[in-house]
Amino acid sequence: KDFCHLPPKPGPCRAAI
C-alpha cells in the first residue's frame, strides 16, 4: 500500500509500485 499520497505520511512513505 502506498501512503505517499495519503496525509499524514506514516514516516517513510511506502510506495507499492
Swiss-Prot record:
Every BPTI/Kunitz inhibitor domain range: 4-17
Domain of life according to the entry: Eukaryota
UniProt GO MF annotations: serine-type endopeptidase inhibitor activity; toxin activity
UniProt site positions, description: Reactive bond for trypsin: 14-15
Keyword annotations from UniProtKB, A to Z: Disulfide bond, Protease inhibitor, Secreted, Serine protease inhibitor, Toxin
Keyword Transport in record: no
Entry's localization field: Secreted
Cellular component aspect of the GO annotation: extracellular region
Organ and tissue specificity: Expressed by the venom gland.
Function: Serine protease inhibitor that inhibits plasma kallikrein (Ki=1.7 nM), and plasmin (Ki=33.0 nM).
Family: Belongs to the venom Kunitz-type family.
The protein, known as: Kunitz-type serine protease inhibitor OMI
